[in-house]
Amino acid sequence: IESGLLKDDLGLVYEIGTLSKILAPALRIGYMIGPGGPLLDAVVQKTSDAGFSAPLINQEIASYLLDHHASEQIARVNAGYRQKAKSVRHWIDSQLGDHLVECRGGSAGFYFYLTLDGIATHENSAFFRFLARTTGRPEIDGHPPDKHPRVVYLPGEFCVHPQGDLVTIGQNQFRLSYGFEELPRIEQAIDWMRQAISYAHTSGG
């Protein structure tokens, strides 16, 4: 998408972003680009007052990377996320497809939004408890302190207005992130989701 700054004849556009997703997450550097004036001055002052700026060495590293390697790095990052999205969508379709009502996402950002067919996903559901390893069954949860690996997702109930029209369907939805974890672990997590669906069917919850 072309930046609005390129056609901002009135000086009204400010672009805000982060370098964490395209350069290196550990840098923890955000940026704001726009016309000089009271707003930009206030943001700079507030950042300085709060002491929230990244260390100067990190800023210098980021500046160098932007000047010398940004285009190539952005292309690599975009290609990497594109491949991750394709792989994750393939596993979702192959492992969970028979139980899916809808799957959205994967074209921008780092999330897929899934709607399951008759499977509750809220915090008290069998699906959630299986993946959180809180079923109370050692063969599923593991034995403390060696609990089996867990899968963390955002239940759909937290993505809809509590008094809105989507409350009911939100009980069968969840958001799955693919931005951070490596692909082999994501594939394994989706297989555990398949197992969680089977558990939910047999446990009635």
Residue ranges of predicted features:
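PLP-dependent class I/II
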Residues: I1-G205
